From Swiss-Prot:
Gene inactivation effect: Normal levels of methylation at cytosine 2860 of 25S rRNA.
Keyword Zinc-finger part of the UniProt annotation: no
Gene of this entry: NOP2C
One term of GO molecular function: RNA binding
The protein's role, per its UniProt record: Involved in ribosomal large subunit assembly. S-adenosyl-L-methionine-dependent methyltransferase that may methylates the C(5) position of cytosine in rRNA. May play a role in the regulation of the cell cycle and the increased nucleolar activity that is associated with the cell proliferation. Seems involved in the regulation of cell proliferation.
Protein name: rRNA (cytosine-C(5))-methyltransferase NOP2C
GO BP of this protein: RNA methylation; rRNA processing
Entry annotated with the keyword S-adenosyl-L-methionine: yes
Source organism (scientific name): Arabidopsis thaliana (Mouse-ear cress)
Span of domain PUA: 158-265
Start-end of Polar residues biased regions: 413-424
Ranges of biased composition (kind: Basic and acidic residues): 399-412
EC number: 2.1.1.-
C-alpha cells in the first residue's frame, strides 16, 4: 500500500506524465518518419517525369571511361527525352519547302495541338533549316518539359493508366496512347475520365534478366500499398482523357485508349500528313546522304536500305537521275522501301532482296543476273555490269593484314570468356521474339527470289548504314539488355559487312559508314579496323559538317581485350552527333572513306 501511495504523489505523477509524453512523442515522430519512408517521395517528386536510364554496370563503366563521367551523365539524361523539334525532309521532286511550310502551318493552326506549339514570341513553330545546302529541310518546333498538374494526394490520387515502355517512347514523340500499349489501369475508369499516364519499366530479375513483372489487365491502386507504386514514381508523361472504359481498354484490339491533351513534351504528330511530299527523318540521317555526295547518273548501293529514308534522300540529291540499288535481307522490308519510293515518285530506285554479308559475288560463283523486285512485286532479271578487274580484287580479298589477324585473335579469345553472357543475351532476345509473336518484318506472303550479289567494283558509291545497337535513338527509357560482349559483337558483325562494302566500290569511289549508336565499338573501332586492314582507304572530309569529333585513343577491358579507336588528326574527319549537344539530335556516327588504288 505504501508503494502505491508513493506513486500517487503529485510530484511523482507529474514526472511520470512528462516522461510518458516524451516517449509517445518520440514514438509518433518515429512512426511519421517510418510512414514517410513507406510513402516514398512527395507528390511533386512522384507525379513528374524524371527517369533514370538504367545500363548494364559493365556497359556503364565502359561508356564512362570513353566519354568521362560528367559527359556520359549528360548523354544518358538527354537520351530519356525527345528532341525539341521534328525534322522533315521535303520531297523536292514533287513540291517546295515554302509550299510545305505553308501547308503545315495551316494544318497546325486548324488543330488544338498547333495552338500549344506557337513560340513564346508568337511566331510559327514551322521553320526552314538554316544550314547551307539543307533548305529542303523543315523543322517543326516543340516544347517541354512542361509541369503537369495532376490531381494528386493520398486522399484523392489520380486515376492512372500504365503503358509499356515502347508505347511511352512513341507518346513522348507525339503519338497518342493506343490500346495495345496499355498494360494496367486503375479500377472504375470510365470513358471521359481524367487519367494520369505513367510508364511500366523493366525491373531486374533474380537470374540477371529484365522484365515488367506484370500481367496485362492488372488493377492499379494508386496507394503505397500498391506493389507497383514505387516503380511508377517519376515516370508520369501526362494527363489525358480516357477514350474507353477500363473494360474497353482490355477488350478491344485497337484504337485510342487515352487522348493525351496535357503532355510533358509537346511535339506534333505528323503521321499520314502530306504523304509523298514530306518524310519525317532525323537530321543526322539527312546529313548521311550529303556525306555520300551522290552525283547525277552514278550507280549507288544502299546496302541496308529499309525503311528507305536514306535511299530516297539520296534520290533527291541525284534529282532522280542515275541508279540506286536499295538492298535488304527481308522481303517485307524491301516492300516497305518499294512503297515509299513509289509514294514519293522516284524512278531511279531499284529494290533488291540481299543479305549484306553476301553482297559480293566473286567470278567463280557469279551468275549472269540477279533477281530484283520491281514496284509491282513481280520479279525480273537485271544484268550486272562487267567485272572491271578480277585480278585486282582477288589480291584484295586474299590479302590479310595484321589488323585483320589481330581482330580474329581477339574474337577467338573473347568468345570463351563471354560465352555465358552471349548465351544469356541470345536467350533474352529470343524470349522476346516468342512473346511478341511474328513481327511485321517476317514474310507473310510469297517469298522474293534471292539476289546472287554483285561483282566487285560495281558501284560508284556505297552507303553502309549498318544494323547496330541503336543506343543513340531517343527518347530511350531503358538500356539494360546490352552487355559489353553484345556491344563488341555488334562491331564484329559490322566489320564483316564493311568487308563486303569495300569490295563493291570502284577505285576512286566513295564508301560511307554510319550508325545510330553512341557505342565506340561500333563507331571509332570499326573505322580503325577499316583503315588498318585496307590501306587504300582514307578518311575524307564531309560536307556539311555539323557533328562533333570522334574519340581518339584506345580502351583496355578487364578481360585483356584492347579496342583501338581513332588516331590524332582523324577525329575531325568523322562526324559524331551527341544527344546532349546544342543540336539536340539523336546519337549518330558518320565516316566517309575515299577508295584509292586496290593493289
Amino acid at each position: 500500500m505504501s508503494k502505491a501511495r508513493v506513486l500517487l504523489k503529485p510530484s511523482s505523477l507529474t514526472t511520470c506524465l512528462t516522461r510518458a509524453k516524451a516517449f509517445f512523442s518520440s514514438v509518433s515522430q518515429s512512426r511519421s518518419i517510418s510512414h514517410q519512408m513507406e510513402m516514398g517521395p512527395s507528390d511533386s517528386e512522384r507525379y513528374c517525369y524524371d527517369p533514370v536510364l538504367r545500363w548494364n554496370p559493365e556497359v556503364e563503366d565502359y561508356f564512362t571511361k570513353a566519354y568521362g563521367p560528367d559527359h556520359f551523365a549528360r548523354i544518358s539524361k538527354a537520351l530519356t527525352r525527345p528532341s525539341s523539334y521534328s525534322c522533315i525532309r521535303v520531297n523536292t521532286v514533287k513540291t517546295t519547302s515554302d509550299a510545305v511550310i505553308e501547308k503545315l502551318t495551316k494544318i497546325l493552326n486548324d488543330s488544338e495541338e498547333g495552338l500549344k506549339l506557337v513560340q513564346p514570341d508568337g511566331s510559327s513553330p514551322v521553320t526552314k533549316c538554316q544550314i547551307p545546302g539543307l533548305d529542303y529541310v523543315v523543322f517543326v518546333n516543340g516544347s517541354g518539359p512542361h509541369k503537369i498538374e495532376y490531381d494528386s494526394g493520398l486522399e484523392n490520387p489520380p486515376k492512372e493508366v500504365l503503358v509499356s515502355r515502347k508505347c511511352a517512347e512513341a507518346v513522348l514523340r507525339g503519338a497518342q496512347v493506343y490500346v495495345p500499349g496499355v498494360l494496367a489501369c486503375t479500377a472504375h475508369v470510365e470513358k471521359g475520365d481524367a487519367v494520369a499516364v505513367c510508364v511500366a519499366m523493366e525491373q531486374p530479375g533474380d537470374e540477371g534478366d529484365w522484365s515488367v513483372n506484370m500481367t496485362r489487365g492488372t488493377t492499379l491502386q494508386g496507394l503505397p500499398t500498391d506493389p507497383y507504386y514505387r516503380e511508377r514514381s517519376g515516370l508520369y508523361i501526362g494527363m489525358g482523357t480516357a477514350m474507353l472504359s477500363r473494360a474497353g481498354m482490355f477488350r478491344v484490339p485497337n484504337g485510342i485508349a487515352v487522348d493525351l491533351n496535357h503532355r510533358v513534351f509537346r511535339l506534333p504528330s505528323l503521321h499520314n500528313i502530306l504523304e509523298g511530299e514530306i518524310f519525317l527523318q532525323n537530321l543526322p540521317s539527312i546529313i548521311v546522304a550529303h556525306a555520300l555526295d551522290p552525283q547525277k547518273g552514278e550507280r549507288i548501293l544502299d546496302m541496308c536500305a529499309a525503311p528507305g529514308g536514306k535511299t530516297t534522300a539520296i534520290a533527291i540529291l541525284m534529282n532522280d537521275e542515275g541508279e540506286i540499288v536499295a538492298a535488304d535481307r527481308s522481303h517485307n522490308k524491301v516492300l516497305v522501301v518499294q512503297n515509299l519510293s513509289a509514294e514519293m515518285g522516284f524512278t531511279c530506285i531499284t529494290t533488291c532482296k540481299l543479305d549484306a554479308l553476301k553482297s559480293v559475288c566473286l567470278p567463280t560463283t557469279l551468275n549472269e543476273s540477279t533477281i530484283l523486285i520491281n514496284g509491282d512485286n513481280s520479279s525480273s532479271m537485271t544484268s550486272h555490269s562487267e567485272l572491271s578487274s578480277n585480278e585486282e580484287m582477288t589480291s584484295v580479298t586474299s590479302r590479310r593484314s595484321e589488323a585483320d589477324k589481330s581482330c580474329e585473335k581477339n574474337d577467338s579469345t573473347e568468345q570463351p570468356n563471354g560465352g555465358d553472357n552471349v548465351s544469356q543475351a541470345y536467350i533474352r532476345k529470343n524470349k522476346g521474339r516468342l512473346k511478341n509473336g511474328r513481327g511485321r518484318t517476317q514474310c507473310q506472303g510469297g517469298r522474293a527470289g534471292k539476289s546472287q550479289g554483285f561483282p566487285p567494283n560495281s558501284f560508284d558509291r556505297v552507303l553502309l548504314d549498318a544494323p547496330c545497337s541503336a543506343l543513340g535513338l531517343r527518347p530511350r527509357l531503358f538500356a539494360g539488355l546490352e552487355t559489353v560482349v553484345s556491344l563488341r559483337n555488334h562491331g564484329w558483325y559490322q566489320r564483316k559487312m564493311l568487308d563486303q562494302a569495300v569490295q563493291l566500290v570502284r577505285v576512286g569511289g566513295i564508301l560511307v559508314y554510319s550508325t545510330c549508336t553512341i557505342n565506340p565499338s561500333e563507331n571509332e573501332a570499326v573505322v580503325r579496323y577499316a583503315l588498318d586492314k585496307y590501306r587504300f582507304l582514307s578518311l575524307a572530309p564531309q560536307h556539311p559538317r555539323i557533328g562533333g569529333p570522334g574519340l581518339v585513343g584506345r580502351c583496355e577491358f578487364p578481360d585483356g581485350y584492347i579496342e583501338e579507336w581513332l588516331k590524332p588528326g582523324e577525329e575531325e574527319l568523322v562526324q559524331k552527333f551527341d544527344p546532349s549537344s546544342e543540336l539536340d539530335t539523336i546519337g549518330f556516327f558518320i565516316a566517309k572513306f575515299s577508295v584509292g588504288p586496290k593493289d
